[in-house]
Structures are given as C-alpha cells and as structure tokens.
Amino acid sequence: MLLKLILILCFLVTLSLSVKVDSADPALFTQGPTIASGGTGNTGANPCYGHDDEDGSKDPAMFTQGPVSSGSGSGSGGYCPHHKNRAQEGGKKDTTKEQPKENNNNKNLGRHSSSGSGSGSGSGCGVTGDTGTGSGRTTAPVNDGVTYKSSNVKETEQYRGGAGRGKHNQATEENVQDCGEITGW
C-alpha cells in the first residue's frame, strides 16, 4: 500500500514538472471588462425649403431636396486581460528581469488595456434622413508581463472600437434656407 502511494506521488511530481513554462497559453488570460462607446459628429449643412408662390408659406409638405448634410463621430473601446497565477501551474519565476512591484506576490501577473476606434457618417435631406453607424476593429500586442518565462512571448488580441454616429439637420422652419420660389405644385 505504501509502495502504491509512493508511485502515485512520484507520478504527480513528474507531471507537474513537465508543464511548459515558456508557452503563451491563451487560457492563461482572463477576459477583462469590455468598454465601447460612440461619439456623435458635427451636423452638416442645412437643407433648403420651397415655398408656395401664392402665399409664401413654409409648408413642410413642399420641402425640396436641399444640400446633403452629413457628420461623423468616433468611439473607443478596449479590454483589460489579467494574467493568471502561473506559479500554480508549475511555472518558474524569471529572475533575469526586474519584477514589477505589484507582481511580487504572484497575483494578477500583468495587466494590459487597449483601445480601438470606429467612425460612421449619416446623410439626409428634406424632412427625413438617416443616421449612419460604424465600428472599428484592430489588433494589438499583449504581453503577459515580465514575471515569468513566457514574458518574451506576445499574444495578439483583438478588440473592437465603439461605433461612430453621424447626424444631419432635418428641415424645419427654424433651420432651413430659402431656396427660392417653387412653381408647379
């Protein structure tokens, strides 16, 4: 019975020593919070309106297609992965590099944040229009810190930027421009 326990113990020790310490295993990264937000761009030019040639009224039903109005905006987003404790997985501490003070206790071995951007535009004229949206996606190198042997391996993670929104002026009596007398209504 004692021999079996010794054999099992030897097997477990051998297994723990066989763990690769220089591999950049994506499973060692935990997903942090994802932040995405969009901005609104500047408003474009005002549309124009047509008026009745009989009484000069500004009838919304007689709005004509004025200049196209457009705007663009950008947003940002990113995430902050946290490296798990490699010491629990048989990793050896890399003593060849200076250790970050926050990592002395082998907790949260590396923290990284990234940000992306996106843009969009919207255009419209007359009484109705539309708002455009867009999003950006890019990659950035993520290093697991300088605490363990795998610190010289960079992982490329993707993050998504927030959507940008464009807007335009809708034709109202307050913001439209008089584009002249319209006949043939």
From Swiss-Prot:
<feature type="compositionally biased region" description="Basic and acidic residues">
    <location>
        <begin position="86"/>
        <end position="101"/>
    </location>
</feature>
<feature type="compositionally biased region" description="Gly residues">
    <location>
        <begin position="117"/>
        <end position="135"/>
    </location>
</feature>
<dbReference type="GO" id="GO:0005576">
    <property type="term" value="C:extracellular region"/>
</dbReference>
<feature type="compositionally biased region" description="Low complexity">
    <location>
        <begin position="103"/>
        <end position="116"/>
    </location>
</feature>
<protein>
    <recommendedName>
        <fullName>Uncharacterized protein DDB_G0274485</fullName>
    </recommendedName>
</protein>
<feature type="region of interest" description="Disordered">
    <location>
        <begin position="30"/>
        <end position="185"/>
    </location>
</feature>
<keyword id="KW-0964">Secreted</keyword>
<keyword id="KW-0732">Signal</keyword>
<feature type="signal peptide">
    <location>
        <begin position="1"/>
        <end position="18"/>
    </location>
</feature>
